[in-house]
Every structure is written in structure tokens, then in C-alpha cells.
């Protein structure tokens, strides 16, 4: 067990990589020397963490509160993660969203973490805080605010301007995190400074980290410590090279962790598993890098992101599906991982332009919990089986990982077996998989192992074990089932539980058609079958041996006080392990000392308590569902589900049982095509009398950007405070009659588009691709211009978000906007440029919805995307029925009321389609979807792939009025028509989830200075 002890750091003198002044070595050493016995609630040894003195496997899921901007729904997600058997959540905070205006960190409304911490505590979830300042996370600029991109210093270096820029945010978030630490009764147990800080340009792996890099990490750590953070720090080294591990000096963290994505990201070919990142020796690398801390994987692939022109997140869910979870996650357990975080477990939404340019609105990520908070993906259930097994297997946490060798223990070279040997216990674990982990074939084998009754070859009663397709299995020997010894089991363990009167219930499972076998000591009574049939049983030496073939039929055996359930894997999916509340300070947090109930209960069970001799359950059902209490620590005489008493019966084996009746509710949703839509021209800039007097003049003759501009002034959007959504440029000149073409090189990120006009004449569009971040092109002018007459180019650019970056590359600074331009017959200085983005730029108008929610379009600048704008004077026109007859931008708005039944969780989404016969529905066009002011969809008709845009309750008012607006940007001369737009519901779920308080929805009011 290790406490946060004093660190004595030898600081070697070395030159800085960057020229700007660096932070003082002395101040960083002083900070390290003050880290003596900061707390004793979270400690560790080489095997695992201890929380309040109890050894815990930390099984964590990644969930970002900023991607679900309805605080009232955070508890729902936490409960679904708790029900997986997880006990922790890792979360990022996004500096770019919280300090979009320099010096003003927004921490109220949807940006407040108070409810996040409260909900985590109530759900029994410990938190791993990851405030950055750089987070990556497929966010625009990796979470770095746009104004920071203007700095001269290299981002993530020890440059004085960069470090000082982080101070206000890190001090603010540090104090918020400190207040929520376990030492203050909160849920935060670990904190991670920076993120994947493992490379630097022109620095080799052996030379990294340099003194400069160490200073950057140490500075972030000091910021957190100065703010009062005392819980252990942890690093996520995506190189697995020991960077910043304990004992490495300046910048070292308390715990060493890695992150890895071995399945990679090809969602278009999800059945092709890559092999070059599959880990085989992590137990050795960890022992070399950090032998005194538990093996921690701070990020491991739980899905994948998809990009513009991709295949949708469903392909990503297939890439990292239940089979991958069985094979690749179990491979990690073979290395003895003690802290395991799955990225993502709930992804959410890149609403309000918060994502980077490589992703679209959905951040579903193919995660175990879908974007609309559903848990129907099979990998949710597979993760539940694994997490619950590890939770009741304390011997795993102290076991010593062995080496996986093909043919060992089986004599079959097509099988790889990785042993974990009991360390202070008699329990051994054997992880079995195909030698070629990508294999989809079937192979038969026998397992020869040593047990307390001697060496045995399993199965003993004839036949063979099998691996069918992509699979991996945990076999155990001498496994402790609460004072009963399970001599061996080829079937996997879901869980075991303590019942009343010293009863123990063990749940084993396997795949359909598999043959399995387990053995019990012969001093127990001969096992008897009390439910099911077709079980073979014999005494072998000093053991009872039981064999069966897995079918959908449940089999239950009893041997004295031990009850064993033999299940088909898909039946095990329907079982839930719920920890009963305990006294403070444990309360709802997971603890090996707590009592549990085991219930078969369908779609979701959330919580349990025993009150007044009744078992009170909360949960969700999507069909009429039988409940059966498989195990409980005491007897009771009734079941209450979501507050309703159920008629109880007894099952065949005497368990208390009941049925939850499901009745689909009546749901009435508006037909968006039939609504009264109001229309506004949102590109008045191309009208002959438009004045851009209030626009930003682009007169900067310098830039700190590493890409130097070529004209007389810089045209980069970030240099003028515009960082997302969309951009509009206006280039003024006087004609001389020699104009025949204009050259424009524009940048908007992958998937971007642009449209260009000369006065009122449409010159064409770049409609975008899934590859181009920039696009240079010559555009022919359609007619001879009149000498001496003023003209103006209007250029609309879609801003898809900034890039992410590897440390030191400054890739996130790559400019958006116009990079280069030329006009035939003119010097470039003849054009005078103005531009706009969102109204106010960094002094953005809507602090409620954040700095990136709005773009440059006229309706957005005026705030008409917000509820209750002055639409009475707008003409009636529908994006679905009418659309646009030429290139341009239209803005459409409507309102409707919803009155959905309470007691049901009813996921809603807006679905775009091309069902219209009008040819304009097949043109290149782009839409933004605003729901009560929140931008919850960017739809690209000709590129895709996203057509379905979930919007959560709390953004949509399920019992009230909703304001919906759609911007329609037609990129082709024939115009555009939204071929179809529907509000659709998924299967309603009878649910115990709490109806959320709506997110703040301030409405329209006149904006000072709007143009």
C-alpha cells in the first residue's frame, strides 16, 4: 500500500525547447516537496487501488458531461453504468467550451459540475477527473479555446504565454474538483493532468520527455495541487514507454497508466480486425515501467469515431462489438489490469459545433450505451458479465500474470492460454483464446491443469471444450465461492452471491451448444438437479464432476448450501447484480463488504433496497417482464417495482417471483411537414443594398500562426476571434475590366464546403469531401466587369471544427477561412476584406449554450435560432414542402407542443431523408438543426453519413412548447429541398429514470450591434 509520500526530485539543468521564458524550476520543486501525506483514503500497492482501506478493481466507463447538456439526465447514465457492475467513471472537461471568452470561465447552468458530482455519488460512482487543459477527445482543438490558438508560443510547451493562458481555467476547475474529492465526501478519487503527452517533434522516444516536457506536466500538476487537489495523479501514456511514471523525476505522477486502441478505427470494414496493435506483453512492460503501482489502462477502446462520408456509428459498434469485448478485454485481464477505463461507455452528442473536424454531430462512438441512452447493444451485456465476475473475484486482483503460450495447457497450437496464478490464494485463472485472435473458426480442446485434488484434464466426463468464432473464456481452478471451493469450471462465472442462512448462489454460463464441466469437493452432498434436465454427473476421485451442454434451458443444481445456476449466455444477460445501500461513508459506492441481491429482470435493473420486509427495485422494461429473485441476503415477502407492489409468486425452485406488465403508451408526435413554417432569407449579404459596415475589417498585417499568409493582410478566422460554426467573407474591389477569374484557397476542415458570389451572381460551390481540409480552386467570372464599378465577393465557408494534435505540432492552429486568393488583372492588395463569424466572436452572446453554438449566418447573428423570435412578419414557407429555388441560405422556423406520458423514457430524434420526388432533394445542401436554441444537428445531404439526430428530453420539452429552426444552405444553382424531416420515437421504455428539469432555454431578445 502506497501513500502520497514526499518526492525528492533532482532537477538537471537543461535548455528549453522553446524560446519563451519557462516556468521556474524552483517553484515546481517546491510544489513536489509539499506533497507529503496529502490523504490516506485512496492508496495502492502493486496490484490495485485501496479505497477507504478496501482493495478494489476500478472498472470505469468514460462519459463526458458536456456531450449531454441536460444535467438531469446524468444520473440516468450513471445508473446504467453502475448496473454494468462498474464502479467508476472517467470524465473530461472542455476548456474551450468553458473559457471561450478569455478570463471568463463559465461554471453555471449546463457547465456546472455540481449535479454531475451529486449524481455520481448517489449512483455509487467514483470519478476520475481529467481537466486537461488539453483533452483531445475528438473535440475542436482538443478542448483548447480558440483565443489560445493566436498565441506565439507552442501549445502544450513551457512557453510563458501558453502556461499563463491555462491558469484561470485550471485554477477554477482545480477548485471545483478539489471540493468534490473523496476527502471532502465527494466522488473524485483520481485526477489526470494533461492527456497523452508522449511525443514531441524531433525528439526521439528515448529522449522524451525533455526537461521542457517535464516542466509542462509538472506545471499542470502544480496548478491542481495549488487549487487543493490531493487525490493521486495519473498519466495516460499512449506509447506505453513509462513516461511520467513514479520515480521518473520532474512531472512524474503518482500512478502510471497507459491507453490503447488496438481495434483502430476502420468502421467501414468492421469485421476485419487489425493485428498490429494487439498487445501480448503488457504485464512485462508495466513491471518494467512502474512495478510499485497497479497496472492501469486509463483509456481502452470501447468503440470508435466515424467521419464525414463514413458509414455511421453503427459500423463502429460492430467493429468493437460483444465479440471484441470478449476477446480483447479478456486479453487485458491476462495482464492483471487493476484500473480499467473503457473509452467511451456513453458517447453523447457533438452538439453546438463542439466536435473536431474529423467527426460529425453524433458521438455515439458505437459505445455500450447508445447516444440516446439505450442499452440494447449486446456488448453492454457482455461488459456486465465481465465486470460482475471481476467484482466477486478478489483473487484476481492479487494474481500473478503468466505468459500466454500457444499450445500450453491444451496441447493445441491453435489455442493460446494465459494463466494468472494465485498469489496468496489457491485460485488460478486461465484465459483461453484462439492463437490467431482474429479467427472466426471453431476449435476443440481439453484443458490440463493442476487443482487441489490433483492434475486433471477437463472435461473428465468425455467430449471436448470448444471455442466457436471470435471468443475467449475464463476458466478457473480452486475458486472461492464464499467458503465453498469450486475445484474447477470450464463455464464462465457471471457472479456469486451470499444468500440467507449461509446459502451461496453461483451463476455459470456458456455459449449455445458448448459443452461445459465443473467440479465440487466430494465432502459436499451429491449435487441434485432442481430445475432443468440433461445433466451428467459422476464422482471422480475426491470430486463431484458435473457436465452439460448449454441450451436456452436453465439448469439449477444444489449441493447442500450451494446453489448453482447453469445458463445460456443470452439468459445470463437478463440477470442483474445490485448492491444494497450501506451506511456512510460507503453509502451507494461499490464495496466488497456490501450485501447484494441477484435478480433476473429483463432490460434494466437500476437499484435495490429491502424495506418493511419487501424488496424494492427500480428499473426499466420494454416488454412484459418476469422477475425472479435468484439470491438475497435475507427473506422478504414481496416485490415493489418502481414504487408499485407486484403480485408475488414462487418459482419452481422456491424463489420469489413476479411480473412487470408493460403497456405501450399512446404517443402523439407532430408531422413536421404539416406544420406552419416561417421563412427568412439568411444570406442578405448578396442583395445589392446590403451594407457590411459593422463587419470586422481584416487589417492585421501579422499573425503568430505557423502558416504565414501571402496577401497584404491576414484573413485567418482565429486571428479575428471566430472559431466555429460558419464563416462569411466579403472582398471589395473596383473593377478594371481585366477580371476573368478569381482564385480562392479556403479552409474549413474535413467535410467543409464553400459557396461564392460576385455581387448577386452565384459563381459556384465546393460541396465538400471526406478527405479535404482545404480546397484551392480557380473560378471563372461569367461576364466582363464594368471598369470603375465597385464589386464584392461573398464567400460562405462551413467551419467543421479545428483539428486535434500530437504535442508540439501546433496542428490545432491550422487556420480556418481564406488561406490565399488572387484576382486576375489585380494586385492582391486591391481587394479589401471583411468577415464575420458568430456575433461578437469571443465575446459571444449566449453564455448559456456556449461559445461554439452559433455561426456566421444572418439568422444566427440575429439570434433567431433562439425560442420566440419575431417571426410574425416572416413569410410562410417550409424547408420540406418549398425549399429554395436557387443557391443561397434560407432559415425556417416552427413551433409545436409535446405532451408525452410520464413514467416512460421515450427517445426522440429528427430524421432527415430524401423521400421527396422533387429533384432538389437530391442536390448538395447542408442543414443545421436548432432545438430550443441548441444546435443539435449538422446534416450534409450529399456526404453524410448521419441522417438521424437524437435530441434528449430536456433539450426537447416533452410536456411543453418547442421551437425548432432549420438553416438550409443550397450549394447548387437549382436550389435545395429537404426531402423529408420527421420527429420519430424509439420504443418507449417503462422507466424509473427521473424526468429531467429542462436545460436552460433563454429565448430571443434584440441583440445590440447585430448586423
Swiss-Prot record:
Its EC number is 3.2.1.23. Transmembrane segments: none annotated. Glycans are attached at residues 202, 406, 423, 455, 588, 622, 704, 745, 759, 772, 778, 913. Residues 1-19 form the signal peptide. Disulfide bonds join 267-316. GO terms for biological process: polysaccharide catabolic process. It is found in: Secreted. It catalyses: Hydrolysis of terminal non-reducing beta-D-galactose residues in beta-D-galactosides. Keywords: Carbohydrate metabolism, Disulfide bond, Glycoprotein, Glycosidase, Hydrolase, Polysaccharide degradation, Secreted, Signal. One of its GO terms (cellular component) is extracellular region. It comes from the Eukaryota. One of its GO terms (molecular function) is beta-galactosidase activity. It is an enzyme of class 3 (hydrolase). Substrate binds at residues 92, 136-138, 195, 261, 365. The active site is at 196 (proton donor), 299 (nucleophile). Its main location: secreted. Cleaves beta-linked terminal galactosyl residues from gangliosides, glycoproteins, and glycosaminoglycans. This is Probable beta-galactosidase E. The gene is lacE.
